[in-house]
Structures are given as structure tokens and as C-alpha cells.
From Swiss-Prot:
Keyword list, A-Z: ATP-binding, Ligase, Nucleotide-binding
Protein name listed in UniProt: Putative glutamate--cysteine ligase 2-3
Keyword S-adenosyl-L-methionine in record: no
Any one GO biological process: modified amino acid biosynthetic process
High-level lineage: Bacteria, Bacillati, Actinomycetota, Actinomycetes, Propionibacteriales
Membership in a protein family: Belongs to the glutamate--cysteine ligase type 2 family. YbdK subfamily.
InterPro entries noted in UniProt: GCL_type2/YbdK_subfam (IPR050141), GCS2 (IPR006336), Gln_synth/guanido_kin_cat_dom (IPR014746), YbdK (IPR011793)
Length: 376
């Protein structure tokens, strides 16, 4: 099967930021996306920057095609400055965690759409439990034949991104012991989770052809890998990160993803064979980061060397500094180092729960406040 990749001549950025809708008083989920759209979209200069998702308790705020992290953040901010007040009119808040700490999946309502209906019809119990939210970052790729090499090498940084963004420690009222319960929930869907590490684009084309012929998917977008090509728009899409509560953490993570992809693609274009790890190391790293977050000891190379994820991260931030300078995101990349200092979202949520004697409403409050504080 032929899949055309509409290459992007520049390493442009696009960001998709998912939010849960929570009630102002109870802090439980509200299936009110339709009402929020009705309030917010007429006020938006570009209504297409606010999307529906699988469940009616979810909205997605998206940027346009941007050239810098700062431009993408400003674009998202402009949309949120309309959507958040529209939520105020409905006694709704936007919640940026990877999971909700106490909501029940049994009362959530499905959004209208054939694709969503088919997903639930096929996946049943697991699909209905997808009370999860994340951030997706697209980076433009100039050459189709480098996409799979960059994708495979980017998986070396899966645990770093997972640990930094982890924001889903509590599920159904219980602390799971995981920094990112979302990561392990989402991979229960049959086409989600870690990607296959193909060497050539033709292998990816053959895979998609097999999936279509056997009825596993109806369209390419149903391949829901943690990192995947987006051929129609010429990007590599990074879907590793949990939901992010505020603009500060988001700008740092987007800068890191932008720099990583551009660095790897530049090296591949220069003829370098990019470093990769065997799938069993990649799989183990994902589990370790989901379980231990910033305390994870991760495998760093194909020779099975290991290191604390934050120590390894510090070296990569230093190495990527010249890339960030070229991309105009030096300040945002430098702020990545502050996430472990401040505490990742999963750590901040646990601290609130401990301080309040396990009050999960207070946990939701704290996540909501972070978004509002960042908007000013």
C-alpha cells in the first residue's frame, strides 16, 4: 500500500492539548462539551482550534502551524482566554491531569461520530474506561525516508518525556503507585502503545496495508501509537505525554520534543546512523517511567547501561542547548530542568492529597488552579 508523506520543508510545530471538564463545585467530570462549544466557538476567531474528543467530558485545544514554541504557546493561550471564561458561564473548569482521581467511567457519555462508536464497539470494557488525557506534539519532517529512523531513535527518550509529564497517579479514588496510570491504561487499546521500530517507510506502508485488509483499522488515524507519523500533514507526532496542567510545563515539554526531533533529523540527514534500543528495552523503560516517574532508573542504550532518568536528562539538555538556540526556544528548554525541582504533576498531586488527608476534590482544585494561574 502506498502512503504519500506530504513533507514539511521546515520543522514546524503543532500542539494538541486535551482537557477534562470538571464541575466547579463537585469537581467530578461533566459531560458538557457540547454546551461549552456552543458558548466558546462563536467567540473564537478560529473555531477549529477547539475540538471534540471520544467522550463528552473532554475538549481539545489545538494550535495552528507554528514555527517556534513561543508562537505555539501564544496561540494556545489566545484560545484558552476564550474557552476558560466560557466555562465559567457554565460552572465548568478545565482540568489538565492525565486521569481524574475519582470519576466513574460508568457514567461518561460518548461523543457522536462513527469512529468513536466503532472504537467502543470493538474495545468494549477497556475502551469505555479511557478517562485519560494527554498532549500531542507534531514536528514537521522534511524527508519521508528519515521518518522511521527518527521515530525509532526518539523512543530512547520515551521515559524522559513520560516521567517529566506524568500526571495520573490516582484512579477511582486509589493511589495506583504509578506516576502515570494513563500510560498503561491507553496501551490496552489494540492499536495503541509503543510503535513498531521499522527501518524503512515501505515497511510502515506494508504494516498499514495489512491492518486495513484484516479490519484492524478503517483509516490510518486509528493507529494510535505513542509516536507515529502523520503523513497527511508531514509530521512526526509525539503522543507520549500525560495531560499537562499549565502553560509553563507545557512550553518546556514542547521545547524538549521540538529539539529532540530536529536534532535527530539533522543527524540523520548528515548520514549518521541514529542510536536505537531493542524493543524489550524500550518496553521496559516505558514501564519504569510510568511506575517510578522521575525516580526511574532507565536503560540508556543498546548495551544495557542504566542511569537515573533525571541525571541522563541533564546531560541531554546541555547537549541540545545549541539546537534550542537555533529554534528560538532556549529559555523554554532550560526550564525543563525546573520540573524535577518543582516536582512533576504526579508529585504535586500526591503532596496535596497527603496534606489534605486524602481529599481528592482538593487534588482536582490544585490542578485547575495551576492552569488559571498560568493564564494570569
Amino acid at each position: 500500500m502506498r502512503i504519500d508523506f506530504h513533507a514539511s520543508p521546515e520543522p514546524t510545530l503543532g500542539v494538541e492539548w486535551e482537557f477534562a471538564l470538571v464541575d466547579r463545585r463537585t469537581r467530578d467530570l461533566r459531560n458538557d462539551a457540547t454546551h461549552l462549544f456552543a458558548r466558546a466557538k462563536p467567540r473564537l476567531p478560529d473555531p477549529d482550534k477547539l475540538h471534540k474528543e471520544l467522550l463528552r467530558n473532554t475538549v481539545e485545544v489545538v494550535s495552528g502551524v507554528c514555527h517556534t514554541v513561543g508562537e505555539a504557546m501564544a496561540d494556545l493561550r489566545r484560545t484558552l482566554e476564550v474557552v476558560v471564561p466560557a466555562g465559567d458561564d457554565l460552572d465548568l473548569d478545565l482540568y489538565g491531569g492525565g486521569t481524574h482521581p475519582f470519576a466513574s467511567w460508568t457514567v461518561q457519555q460518548l461523543s457522536e461520530g462513527h469512529r468513536y462508536e466503532e472504537l467502543i464497539n470493538r474495545t468494549q470494557w477497556w475502551g469505555r474506561q479511557m478517562l485519560i488525557w494527554g498532549v500531542h506534539v507534531h514536528v514537521g519532517m522534511p524527508e519521508r525516508d528519515r521518518v522511521m529512523a527518527v521515530l525509532s531513535s526518539l523512543l530512547n527518550f520515551h521515559p524522559h518525556l513520560q516521567a517529566l509529564s506524568a500526571s495520573s497517579p490516582i484512579w477511582s479514588g486509589i493511589d495506583t503507585g504509578y506516576a502515570s496510570n494513563r500510560a498503561l491504561m491507553f496501551q490496552q487499546l489494540p492499536t495503541a502503545g509503543l510503535p513498531f521500530q521499522f527501518e524503512r517507510w515501505s515497511e510502515f506502508e506494508a504494516f498499514v496495508g495489512d491492518e486495513l485488509v484484516t479490519g484492524v483499522i478503517e483509516e490510518l488515524s486509528e493507529v494510535r501509537w505513542d509516536v507515529r507519523p502523520a503523513p497527511r500533514i508531514g509530521t512526526l507526532e509525539n503522543r507520549i505525554c500525560d495531560g499537562v496542567p499549565d502553560l509553563a510545563d507545557l512550553s518546556s515539554l514542547v521545547a524538549l520534543m521540538h529539539c529532540l526531533v530536529v536534532d535527530l533529523d539533522t543527524r540523520a540527514a548528515a548520514g549518521e546512523t541514529l542510536p536505537t534500543m531493542p524493543p524489550w528495552h524500550v518496553q521496559e523503560n516505558k514501564w519504569r517511567a510510568a511506575r517510578y516517574g522521575l525516580d526511574a532508573i532507565v536503560i540508556t542504550d543498546a548495551e544495557s547501561n542504566e542511569r537515573l532518568v533525571t541525571e541522563d536528562l541533564a546531560d541531554h539538555l546541555e547537549r541540545l542547548a545549541p539546537v534550542a538556540d537555533r529554534l528560538g526556544c532556549s529559555e523554554e528548554l532550560a526550564q525543563v530542568a525546573q520540573i524535577p525541582v518543582r516536582g512533576a504533576s504526579y508529585q504535586r498531586q500526591r503532596a496535596v492529597a497527603e496534606r489534605t488527608g486524602g481529599d481528592l476534590v482538593a487534588v482536582v482544585d490544585s490542578v485547575v488552579r495551576e492552569l488559571r494561574a498560568g493564564l494570569g
